[in-house]
Amino acid sequence: GKGELPDDYFWGDAGNMTTINGLFAAGDATGASSHKFSSGSHAEGRFAGKQAVKWIMANNTMPEVNQADVDALTEMVLKPMAVFEEHSGITSDPDINPNYIIPQQFMFRLQKIMDEYAGGVSAAFKTSDNMLKRGLELMDFLKEDSVKLAARSLNELERCWENIHRMWQADAHLQTLLFRTETRWPGYYFRSDTP
């Protein structure tokens, strides 16, 4: 229980709220393991969702909204559709374009980085300091390319933002793996440089 472990072990409150007031986390966002199972993530997400609703009900104040901020956020959210519309006619295949990247290609790149450098299945769940640092270098390239995400539909627009969120989560995960040098339960990941 909570009283049996040092305070540093607990990253947030008991209701899955992070250290940012009103921001709740579940699944991969709550631990250093890239192999959280969907059943546990589902249960954790349900719990975090219920706690978020309780927090909202207890802290229900109307914010002051600046319409210019809303307009800027709307433009940012819809940018992948504008990128596709602006550049889609320059190639014969809309999936291949030097001016944008479609969500599926972005997802494949992200998965490849995490699988090969963050202790995924293709690396036999092994990683090391050098592998993690290389993964972070490749993640920087992916972040640069994230501004070129393009969407042909509302479904792809959702996939673009899902990829951006996954990219930031993956970056945090790589940073966590780099910081925590111990092996985490053989089968989850193995630090070959500090076994």
Q: Which residues make up each language-model segment?
A:
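Glycine- and aromatic-enriched mobile tails/lids
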Residues: K2-P195
